[in-house]
Design a protein with these regions (language model features):
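Short acidic/glycine-enriched loop/turn segments that link adjacent beta-strands
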Residues: 92-94
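Basic, often amphipathic N-terminal segments
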Residues: 1-84, 88-90, 105-205
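Generic recognition of long tandem-repeat/solenoid scaffolds
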Residues: 12-14, 96-100
Length: 205
């Protein structure tokens, strides 16, 4: 069911380097899964820093891009460039995900980005909220509170450092072949329609 309010949608993702992407694809092929055939492939392999959002009518895309570029030119916290250890594979809701270690500096950066760019997120009216929230199910009272404040329920204590690699339709056996993760860049992404992939429209290496 199409419960989206409008397109395009925007998001901010940390994008793994090519080595990590190749390792994930090889892992999935060992389990007879092709990443490009999965529904989640429209998002690409990534860690979500700012979940997909609708752009406020108060701003345009050019202003969003300029703000994104200025933020990373002035921010000296480059903790996303560190090497992160892969802790294992786990089920998170309806996906299999590789979980990574984290640290306070990295968590602070991600939360700061999420809050900073919330300025550009469209505030939904009551009718739009009733439609949009159908994308989520069985929210706790605190998850609901986060959704109403930030437009996304799985934040802070309900989130951890992970990259979704497959759905749960087929069991994935992890052979510990992926030891670490380096991010290639942090990207401002755009999705133009319900079936289109998220594409990068600006990035910081």
């Amino acid at each position: 069911m199409d419960n989206y309010i409008q397109f395009p949608r925007y998001s901010i993702y940390l994008i793994p380097n090519k080595l990590f992407i190749n390792q994930v694809e090889k892992l999935l092929l060992k389990n007879n899964v092709k990443y490009d055939n999965l529904e989640i492939s429209q998002y690409g392999l990534h860690y979500t820093v700012k979940a997909p959002f609708y752009l406020s009518h108060l701003y345009n895309e050019e202003e969003l891009i300029n703000s994104f570029q200025e933020y990373f030119l002035s921010n000296q916290n480059k903790s996303y460039k560190e090497v992160f250890n892969v802790l294992g594979l786990k089920k998170i809701k309806n996906v299999f995900a590789l979980e990574m270690n984290s640290n306070e500096k990295f968590n602070f950066l991600c939360n700061d980005i999420m809050r900073y760019f919330d300025l550009y997120r469209k505030t939904l009216n009551q009718q739009e909220v009733q439609k949009d929230i159908k994308r989520f199910s069985n929210l706790t009272s605190l998850e609901m509170e986060y959704y109403l404040i930030w437009g996304y329920p799985y934040l802070f204590e309900f989130s951890n450092h992970h990259i979704s690699v497959s759905d749960i339709k087929k069991e994935i056996i992890f052979d510990n072949s992926i030891k670490s993760l380096n991010y290639s860049n942090i990207s401002l992404m755009r999705q133009d329609s319900i079936n289109s992939k998220f594409i990068s429209i600006s990035k910081s290496d």
